[in-house]
Amino acid sequence: MSKPLDVLLVTPPSRVQVYQELSRDFAAIEPPVWSGLLATFLRRHSCSVAILDAEAQGLDHQQTAEQIAAIAPRLAVFVIYGQQPSASTQCMPAGRKVCELLNALGDVPTLVMGTHPSALPRRTLLEEPYTYVCQGEGPATILGLVIALRAPQHSLREVPGLWHMEEGNPVGNAPAPLLTALDQELPGQSWDLLDMTRYRAHNWHCFDNLNQRSPYASLQTSLGCPFTCSFCCINAPFGMPMLRTWSPDNVIGQIDRLVRDYGVTNIKIPDEMFVLNRRHVIGICDRIIERGYRLNIWAYARVDTVQDEVLEKLARAGFTWLGLGIESGSQHVRDGVEKGRFGEGDIVATVDKIRSYGIHVAANYIFGLPDDTSESMRATLDLALALNTEWANFYCAMAYPGSPLYTLARRKQWTLPDDQDGPGWIGYSQHAYESCPLPTDHLTATQVLAFRDRAFVEYFTHPRYVSMLQRTFGAPVATHVAAMCEHQVRRRHHDLAARPAA
């Protein structure tokens, strides 16, 4: 009799609920970065591992549960991360649905991990259908749990970072220490366990060639962030604001493999703070330049961390886009969320500098921060229109579990999606029908959401923006964006507001 698979790493299907119609042609299909890293770690510790990416395979909840039950692993690990770190919470409902269906089919032990479970481990254990919850980044917890499941004499109390039930009571173990030698402990992703042809880049990432969005990969070069922005929950799995990096030699080795074995040229660097450590960035760029690869890479940057020397290297290495966190057009509002280290003049100068190196800018803005008013939100949109960057993401402020803003919202008793009468965790999705952002001291959640949706249309249909698209990328891209604007997301908030009084 063959031994059971030790670990099945599962990505539940959530894209359609999270992005509505935008999921079909416009949003990315992201490879599961954390599953790839965890698989490599576990393999190095003699565990048998497989990855079930139900999202990429187009499986529904029932099909996903049936596949897990058919594989019957020793442990099914639900890896709840989204396209960026704060997107974990909105993926929780899909995981719950699959796990409930799985529990009805058999007795497969389940563990849930991700930013959200790490932020609320006790609540997750009590409210969700999983057998176990992981608090922390995961590798040591999963390995320890597999060892305990293989040999029942091992106590669950010995598994670091594990939450489990004992005699009807939730028990949380001491956290696992963070991995520090990333090159040795998490040396890369197990791409051989994935069908790399299924993944595609964001539409804007490939504006230079919309027909070449696949193949695509997401490559982590660091973990964590040293900053403490109030709206961000990135450090929830790590327990502290800090930055750990893989070496440039390790990173180029992974890029070599992507290019050689999978034909990947579209690459996302999801590190929140990629353009921060000058030596790290230049070391990676120099190695790419030496190889002469023709890549299409995007990465995040901060307004106050972009230097000319770094930009020159990024451009030569194939970094065609930088995502820039501008957040608000109001200095007062930026001050309130720990983003006040730079002013509007700095923002304009940084955007101009990035573009002068031939790098496109994807600017990120947030409406509905705690100090926002109608006037300050309009100022943010006016700044976006003035900058006229090649792409813009417009978000509503969300008090994500694990962020300081969530703690503040609970203390001030602000309305949150997970309140008793709220839509639940899906309400933390920016694009879902059930989206439920924070109110501000001056505006209701409905007003914030309505402004965000109007801002999206105003920006992407603005004649100046459309003209810039045509000049920079050509008429087909302008036509593509116009088609995108026809897919207006529906909102529960607006439907409720539009109902006639009984």
What label would you give each PLM region?
Residues 39-50, 102-108, 261-262, 291, ...:
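A structural motif corresponding to the C-terminal end of an alpha-helix
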Residues 1-9, 65-69, 404-502:
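Radical SAM enzyme core and accessory elements
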Residues 78, 135, 269-271, 324, ...:
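Conserved beta-strand positions
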Residues 2-252, 263:
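Acidic, low-complexity intrinsically disordered segments
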Residues 184, 189-362, 369, 374-375, ...:
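Radical SAM [4Fe-4S] cluster-binding motif and immediate context
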Residues 123-143, 313-322, 379-394:
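Structural recognition of alpha->loop->beta junctions
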Residues 14-20, 85-87, 118-122, 227, ...:
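Flexible glycine/acidic-rich beta-alpha junction loops that bind and position SAM and/or redox cofactors
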